[in-house]
């Protein structure tokens, strides 16, 4: 679902970007 995709993308962003 969209929520799952957003969660995965958010996790990747948090890993790539500090804070």
UniProtKB/Swiss-Prot annotation:
Which Gene Ontology terms of cellular component type are present?
extracellular region
Chain's role: Has activity against Gram-positive bacteria and S.cerevisiae. Has non-hemolytic activity.
Asked if Cell membrane is a keyword of the record, the answer is no
Give the UniProt subcellular location, in the record's own words. Answer: Secreted
Q: According to the lineage, what is the superkingdom?
A: Eukaryota
Task: Please describe the organ and tissue distribution of this protein's expression.
Answer: Expressed by the venom gland.
GO biological process terms held by the UniProt record: defense response to bacterium; defense response to fungus; killing of cells of another organism
Spell out the family assignment given in the record's similarity comment. Belongs to the ponericin-G family.
Q: What is this protein called?
A: U1-poneritoxin-Ng3g
Swiss-Prot/TrEMBL keywords: Antibiotic, Antimicrobial, Fungicide, Secreted
